[in-house]
Amino acid sequence: MYGTIAKMRVKAGMEQQFLQIAETTESVNVPGIVAVYVYQMDANSREFYMTVVFESKEAYVANANSPEQHQRFLQMMTALETEPEWHDGAVVFANA
């Protein structure tokens, strides 16, 4: 499995819109996607972390390079102060 962790700072007052966008994105049938988790930080309610897990690095890269994902990214950016900080890598342990 392979995926990304994104650190995001949401614009003031846009927290609900951001979550709606994230939920809409979650409902799209993205090939190879295994799981999506969104965390809202206790220390700062405008700071979110999103983890996205794919079956493989190839599935992740295919999604990242797709025009559909680019459109979802642009929609998400309407609620964010700046671009997310991305951390990509292999899943080396999971227990669900």
Language model region names:
Residues 2, 35-49, 72-96:
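Glycine-rich beta-strand-turn "strand-cap" elements at beta-sheet edges
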Residues 2-8:
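Active-site-flanking beta-strand signature of metal-NTP-handling nucleotidyl enzymes
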Residues 6, 48, 61:
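Conserved short-loop catalytic and cofactor-binding motifs
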Residues 9-20:
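Short, surface-exposed ligand-recognition loops at beta-strand->loop->(often short) alpha-helix junctions
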Residues 11-13, 41-43, 55-57, 94:
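Short coil/turn motifs at secondary-structure junctions
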Residues 24-35, 53-87:
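An amphipathic, aromatic/His-enriched active-site/gating alpha helix that lines ligand/cofactor pockets
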